[in-house]
Amino acid sequence: MVSLRDNIEAQPLSHNRRIRKNFGHINLVADIPNLIEIQKNSYEKNFLQLNIKDSERKNKGLQSILNSIFPISDSSNIANLEFVKYEFDTTKYDVEECSQRSLSYAAPLKVTLRLSIWDIDEDTGTREIKGIKEQEVYMGDIPLMTKNGTFIINGTERVVVSQMHRSPGVFFYHDEGKVHSSGKLLYSARVIPYRGSWLDLEFDAKDVIYFRIDRKRKLYTTTLLRAIGMSTEEIIKFYYNSVTYKLVKNKGWAVKFIPQHITAHRLTSDLVDADTGNILLKAGQKITPRLAKKYFGEGLNNILVAHETLIGKYLSEDLRDPASDEVLAKIGEMITADMLNVINDLKIKNVNVLVINPQSGPYIRNTLFADKNQDREAALCDIFRVLRPGEPVNIEAAESLFYNLFFDTERYDLSEVGRIKMNSRLELNISEEVTVLTIDDIKNIVRVLVELKDGKGIIDDIDHLGNRRVRSVGELIENQFRIGLVRMEKSVIERMSAGDVDTVMPHDLVNSKILVAVVKEFFSTSQLSQFMDQTNPLSEITHKRRLSALGPGGLSRDRAGFEVRDVHPTHYGRICPIETPEGQNIGLINSMATYARINKHGFIESPYRRVKDGCVTDEVVYLSAIEEGKYKIGQANSKINKDGKLQGEFINCRVEGGNFVMVEPYEVDFIDVTPMQVVSVAASLIPFLENDDANRALMGSNMQRQAVPLIKTDAPFVGTGVEGVVAKDSGASVLALHDGIVEQVDSNRIVIRILEQKVDGSPSVDIYNLLKFQKSNHNTCINQKPLVKVGHYVKKNDIIADGPSTDNGEIALGRNVLVAFLPWNGYNFEDSILISERIVKEDVFTSIHIEEFEVIARDTRLGPEEITRDIPNVSEEALRHLDEVGIIYIGAEVQAGDILVGKVTPKSESPITPEEKLLRAIFGEKAFDVKDSSLHVPSGVNGTVVEVRVFSRRGVEKDQRAIAIEKQQIEKFAKDRDDELEIIEHFVFSWLEKLLVGQVIINGPKQATVGQTITTEMLKGLSKGQFWQITVEDANVMNEIEQIKTHYDEKKEALDKRFATKVEKLQSGDDLPQGALKVVKVFIATKHKLQPGDKMAGRHGNKGVISRIVPEEDMPFLEDGTVVDIVLNPLGLPSRMNIGQILETHLGWASINLAKKISTLVKEYKNKHIGIEQIKKFLIELYGENINSILERPEEEIIAFCKKVSKGVHFATPVFDGAKVQDVKDMLKLAGQDPSGQVKLIDGRTGEYFDRLVTVGQKYLLKLHHLVDNKIHSRSIGPYSLVTQQPLGGKSHFGGQRFGEMECWALQAYGAAYTLQEMLTVKSDDVNGRIKTYDSIVRGENNFESGIPESFNVMIKEFRSLCLNVKLEVTSS
């Protein structure tokens, strides 16, 4: 078999890659993870488990829900419905077809269910199986994710945003002294499950502990402890230790000495060792904890205390009479003076009391005695009364309710994460599979709460990322699915009980509509399922990586405080501290950091490099916020020597709580992978981010997402090196699916022959159909352009076509333009921007915007609507763009008001006169009346029609236009099929030729002589079909030919079948909405040139509006005659502190001057003044080691590379690791420019030099999606509000300018009485007045009369609603 690599003469595509001069110093040991894998992993891997065999599926996602809901049994346990397995059918339409036909991209879910029916013997109660039926049941269409991590719902692309919510588990807090006037801290605990009832425990101001369930009325915590089955003895013994006071005759009590309970104080009595009788300290002397520990260490175990010391202590067991065993006092009671006398009288020698730390109080004992419930039943009934007020109480109902609240897996679920968090916080060791509360949990929550009150341990930080987790798409949809299946379960049980179970099949029991409705509702209306921001590829990626704290189960805007929104130390490397919206959502909507990923428990992890004995390894470890707290972590820019050892005596490290410490190198556990891991994708695209103020960086990253894709794309000269990753992961550009060779290329498609051979050795073909002028969600233009040429060798995942806003595989949101910072006649006051006419003339910032218009022909009560060219009362001129069917031609230039699709609607008939009746009788039936309901171009829209789509209902005859579009599409399918076949045939027949040449013929077509040896010339005379007729002597060759023929036929058949399926789908008609006969969609593309009023911005938060377009000859220019493109105001810099833009401008200036220098060298080389070595030397000086791969190539390729950089040298200055000021100066010197980056500039109007040197350079600017064309409008006559009769406002209502209260004051202050009257009456809501004014204008008169404004009438009506009658009476005088 021949290797297909033999005929690769062309250069690999990788030769075309752009090389950037990189200023970064830190070697990257970890690649940026795929930027949209969060979405894909969560949905496809964890929820659907799509391409995994049934037996290998893990119990998670869809599998776990189905396992938990099934089996479903009926009330009498006769029928039992079990879940066996699930699988997905293939989708009916692909992604493109779904978005064109306004359908959802979804696959049918087929679940195999087994229905078992039992026979129960009424006497013995034994059960026997009566029958088993297994069946595959359709459970509705489940939306699938596209390869870019989005969903197509009703034809629009949507994204499900991940949600940040509080992790399940137990949390301890205090109220920060806000509740009680004294400022006393009241501690509380809250158990938050994944689903189920919340449990709160809290101290009140009197130090009694209460609990509440679901924020209902509070009860004593001991009621909860009794409800879980603890008696008074058990409660006291669990929470308190006991100590025994032994009677020492005539001396007092001997008791154990506990040094931990000693605080510094003066003794009121002597400190006496009970064992020896020695006095250690006299009364009045001071004892300290240190001294107490010393005595304890020297053997002081028991001390003597006075008789009355027992008063005020609490009994740790019942006090009994030694003689009669009668209970004198109950456990927990306080010993009083009377009780002490009884103890002395009865000569009780040992008294057990509770050990209570003097600094804290007997909280649980006090709560126990405040609680009136003395046993479990009373406690359960008390809880029942609070949760079900008004219902009759019985113990069974109370017990069942309490059990269901916290211990039933159906209704309560902590989730695995909740259990892990609970175990770690309470120091328990309960299995992770136990996802309900246990008795140990409740006992220990109370214990920890009391310890916190006593000052042991610290409260939890809610905003710590160890306490907040991410719910991604899969999990959000899983929760919806569970809701749907639980609802469905109820209907299944009802159906089981209703009918005769013996004759029922599983599909009769299941109603999939319930499930489908829930899923549909989530995708269409949920706050987290959002219309994808598709302005440019960056906005797509950012939207998919967004984390929202809002949404169901999350926070609400109004209630979120400052703490939740603030940046937390644990955000480092996980959530971007920069990128968040300005406005009310600030801090609630965040973006994931570039390198972050989400672990299986939903916590965000960040990568670190392991450090062993002060040596930095290349091992990368991902740590969550909880794990990170255990280690000392150094910065990525710590100095490392050649052997990988950390340099310096001390290293600055982060530790728990966001603090920094200096430690020795061997103590460091990890260091950051790269400084870029702190920020998000958008922020990592900003060069010199480290020199910008954070507020401006925030604006910069937000505005990059609003950049409109331009006609001509241009990657930034000054980038950060991340541009390629963003373009690749966004899905905007086209990636090669396999290694291969490019066979055909045109602007619409690329055909690549795959090099990975199948088992049969025949090649396969990839055909990439490029998107041409498609409308995005935000009406920007999606257009793909090939980057490869015929013969190029491409590798898997190479970029073979650029998409919107990409240039040579790098993201390109704007253009590089020559900028000067100087004031120019006040035209750049307040951030205005002055631009040169060249920018408009050469379409530098021109963008294409596509709008979609749709018309539906419906079946009405009076008859069907019709799409036609025959429209009543319309001139031929108005129909000039329509074809014979009444649909506009592609390529037509349209203006506002033009007809796009002609449509007529039947009109209800008015009663006819007798004369008309007579005429109808004579001349036959007149055609019924129709009215014009055509689709017109709305105001403010003009452009070129780029596409028309016609959809006809199944069974309705197609019109000429639909047939023409269909024919065009079929031709496209046929071309794809023929090209693929041609490549396969070329391969097959060249292989056959290699096999046959030199063989001896024993049978064959007429041209072949038996016994002849086959030659290449002889085979050229045969047709392809005759190749198969040849038989040769060699049996092995014949076998191989037989195999080739079989595979070739199979391949051909598969291609024909695929073609037939596509054609059939195309011709079968469409599923249109109810009542629609035909739908026509027209797409109009508009070119938007840059004009005054458009908003532009840089990447550093420097934004402004264009104020004026100046002729080139008036713009300032350089000494070599180059005219500046844009003039910006230097005052926009100092106060805003975004100095990054100046460094970018300087480096951009170096970039174009280095390019000029390279061009000069190439020119000299061509004129034979210098050799290639000088060029190589300069390139090495400029690029460093980066350029070695280019310099090893032939001379002509080096010159070709130099030509590529003739417009500007591309730099990469990574975030926080980029070029310093000195590097910029070095580049300017290398380019032969002044290191200040300033030049002499000449005024275009006067021809004189400006007084001072001016900063000039290349800067990357973006045109934002705030175009003046979409904002400006004017009103002549338009709609009025119904009640107030005032003109409406806003562009969509064709409204006017509001003349508000303050505007009235201005006219009053000016004394313009008549203007004011006109504004408040005829120009506003005086209905009669405006009609009269209109009449007088028509007659050519200039006077008007104003009446009563409608708002006055409204006010009178409001008075009347308050029963006050107001009349306006005009007296005759």
Swiss-Prot record:
Q: How does it assemble?
A: The RNAP catalytic core consists of 2 alpha, 1 beta, 1 beta' and 1 omega subunit. When a sigma factor is associated with the core the holoenzyme is formed, which can initiate transcription.
Native source species: Rickettsia peacockii (strain Rustic)
* Matches recorded under InterPro entries: DNA-dir_RNA_pol_bsu_ext_1_sf, DNA-dir_RNA_pol_bsu_external_1, DNA-dir_RNA_pol_su2, DNA-dir_RNAP_su2_dom, DNA-dir_RNAP_su2_hyb_sf, RNA_pol_bsu_bac, RNA_pol_bsu_CS, RNA_pol_bsu_protrusion
Record's catalysed reaction(s): RNA(n) + a ribonucleoside 5'-triphosphate = RNA(n+1) + diphosphate
In its UniProt record, which GO terms are filed under biological process? DNA-templated transcription
- Which named protein is this? DNA-directed RNA polymerase subunit beta
Q: Which SUPFAM superfamilies match?
A: beta and beta-prime subunits of DNA dependent RNA-polymerase (SSF64484)
Q: What role does this protein play?
A: DNA-dependent RNA polymerase catalyzes the transcription of DNA into RNA using the four ribonucleoside triphosphates as substrates.
Report the family membership.
Answer: Belongs to the RNA polymerase beta chain family.
What is a single Pfam family found in this protein's UniProt entry?
RNA_pol_Rpb2_7
